[in-house]
């Protein structure tokens, strides 16, 4: 794996000279191998080690290189055709493979090759970009978007219209991460490598980026880029120092309790894959 990493790093440094017609066959093979590993979940762009998230930048570089290496090709769709560099994940799936991987994909859901979808995951008409990792038991609801290289944990609910930011454009250092057992409310946007820690509930219409103040009303603390575990977050405002105006902020109103869990708990009837 280390040798592969070094070859990807070297190719990335020379990316300005790479085109689909001039790329070295070995570089093409290496990048395709990484995309295949990401697709199977054998590697992931970020993983939690000893309680801390670590980003494997070389895997992200391989994803970026794929856009330099692979040419556009016609992709067949149910009602139309597409023309893109990245094939669709499920293009060659049959009934047996869907059953073996225990996933449900509702018509018009789009998943690009190079993203991993865990068992017992339900994809409503949504979009999952390449390099993303969607773990087991997660629901990606209607019109939700999982951006490039984003990391979605187990038993997460991404409600309708949710946007989870990617890393490719604009180029971000680290992926957006939603940890296990989180609920992201409708039309909320979590971007720019923000980490929503385990068991948190984000209300409808909350927008969080790296510069967003995340204010804990119980403690007075202000967080940036991280929603502490078990937080219930709503959209709000904080006053300016001069008192003449207020600016948007995400407000931690409380910690998750039994009442909250009752409202956002997973409906097992909707997660039946068999």
Swiss-Prot record:
Q: Which CDD domains match?
A: LbH_THP_succinylT
Q: What is its EC number?
A: 2.3.1.117
Q: Which InterPro entries match?
A: DapD_Trfase_Hexpep_rpt_fam (IPR005664), Hexapep (IPR001451), Hexapep_transf_CS (IPR018357), THP_succinylTrfase_dom1 (IPR023180), THP_succinylTrfase_N_sf (IPR037133), Trimer_LpxA-like_sf (IPR011004)
Q: In which pathway does it act?
A: Amino-acid biosynthesis; L-lysine biosynthesis via DAP pathway; LL-2,6-diaminopimelate from (S)-tetrahydrodipicolinate (succinylase route): step 1/3
Keyword vocabulary terms for this entry? Acyltransferase, Amino-acid biosynthesis, Cytoplasm, Diaminopimelate biosynthesis, Lysine biosynthesis, Repeat, Transferase
Q: Which GO terms describe its cellular component?
A: cytoplasm
Q: Which domain of life is it from?
A: Bacteria
Gene Ontology terms: biological process: diaminopimelate biosynthetic process; lysine biosynthetic process via diaminopimelate
Entry protein name: 2,3,4,5-tetrahydropyridine-2,6-dicarboxylate N-succinyltransferase
Originating species: Shewanella sp. (strain W3-18-1)
- The record's gene field reads dapD
């Amino acid at each position: 794996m280390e040798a592969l990493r070094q070859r990807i790093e070297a190719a990335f440094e020379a990316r300005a000279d790479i085109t689909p017609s001039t790329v070295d066959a070995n570089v093409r093979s290496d990048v395709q191998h990484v995309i295949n590993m990401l697709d199977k979940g054998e590697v992931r762009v970020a993983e939690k080690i000893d309680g801390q998230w670590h980003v494997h930048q070389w895997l992200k570089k391989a994803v970026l290189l794929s856009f330099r290496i692979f040419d556009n090709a016609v992709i067949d769709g149910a009602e139309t055709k597409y023309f893109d560099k990245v094939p669709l994940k499920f293009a060659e799936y049959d009934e047996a493979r869907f059953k073996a991987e225990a996933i449900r994909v509702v018509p018009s859901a789009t998943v690009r090759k190079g993203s991993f979808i865990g068992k017992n995951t339900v994809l409503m008409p949504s979009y999952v970009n390449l390099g993303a990792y969607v773990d087991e038991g997660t629901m990606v609801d209607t019109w939700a978007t999982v951006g490039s290289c984003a990391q979605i944990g187990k038993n997460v609910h991404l409600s309708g219209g949710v946007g989870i930011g990617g890393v490719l454009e604009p180029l971000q250092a680290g992926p957006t991460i939603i940890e296990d057992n989180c609920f992201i409310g409708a039309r909320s946007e979590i971007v720019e490598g923000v980490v929503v820690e385990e068991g948190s509930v984000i209300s409808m219409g909350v927008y969080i980026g790296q510069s967003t103040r995340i204010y804990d009303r119980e403690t007075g603390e202000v967080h940036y880029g991280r929603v502490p575990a078990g937080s219930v977050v709503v959209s709000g405002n904080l006053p300016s120092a001069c008192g003449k105006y207020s600016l948007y902020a995400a407000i931690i109103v409380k910690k998750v309790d039994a009442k909250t869990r009752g409202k956002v708990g997973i409906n097992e009837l909707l997660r039946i894959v068999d």
